[in-house]
Amino acid sequence: MQSLQDKASVLSGVDQAEAFAIDESNLFDKLGLQTFINLSTNFYTRVYDDEEEWFQSIFSNSNKEDAIQNQYEFFVQRMGGPPLYSQRKGHPALIGRHRPFPVTHQAAERWLEHMQNALDDSVDIDQDSKIKMMKFFRHTAFFLVAGNELKNQNEKPKHKPQCACKHAANKPAEE
């Protein structure tokens, strides 16, 4: 059976070594807290202003300020900073936390488009860090897609086999 990380690599086109190159240096020390706050604010401004109703609806039950805080705290923690997210919310458990949302290929690509644009606008992040971060984000987005697909497979209703008798389908209803 293929692991979710392996499936994420296949779906995203980013192998695990590239995805986790963010661990080779401490991006939090390099970039600082405010850079992550600015990135998440820029990103969620784009998300909440998205013209595509199907995408915007994914976030309709989420408070924008909470989403910004959750994201930048997770990024800070994941990229070498203090465990802000875990201190406030517990283990990140990304798949579980994203369970209520329709994390599809299309949604992941749209999310990544907004993140790429937010990164492109971030003058405080050097190009090498942007590339490493985007590879991590792409792999992680498709890790969530793989988790969502697995969840959907496990939640499919189990139907009892119908009678495969060819005569039953053509039999006239009795009155």
Curated annotation (Swiss-Prot):
Homodimer when ferric. Interacts with RGLG3 and RGLG4. The gene is GLB3. InterPro entries: GlbO/GLB3-like, Globin-like_sf, Globin/Proto, Hemoglobin_trunc. GO terms for molecular function: heme binding; metal ion binding; oxygen binding; oxygen carrier activity. Disruption phenotype: Slight reduction of the number of shoots produced by root explants in vitro; root explants are first cultured on an initial auxin-rich callus induction medium (CIM) followed by a transfer onto a cytokinin-containing shoot induction medium (SIM). Hemoglobin-like protein that exhibits an unusual concentration-independent binding of O(2) and CO. May promote shoot organogenesis from root explants in vitro. Inhibits RGLG3 and RGLG4 ubiquitination activity. This is Two-on-two hemoglobin-3. The lineage of its organism: Eukaryota, Viridiplantae, Streptophyta, Embryophyta, Tracheophyta. One of its GO terms (biological process) is response to hypoxia. Expressed ubiquitously, with higher levels in root tissue than in shoot tissue. Keywords: Heme, Iron, Metal-binding, Oxygen transport, Transport. Residues 153-175 are annotated as: Disordered. Its cofactor is heme. The keyword Transport applies. Binds 1 heme group per subunit. Heme binds at residues 85, 98. The keyword Heme applies. Transmembrane segments: none annotated. Disulfide bonds: none annotated. It comes from Arabidopsis thaliana (Mouse-ear cress).
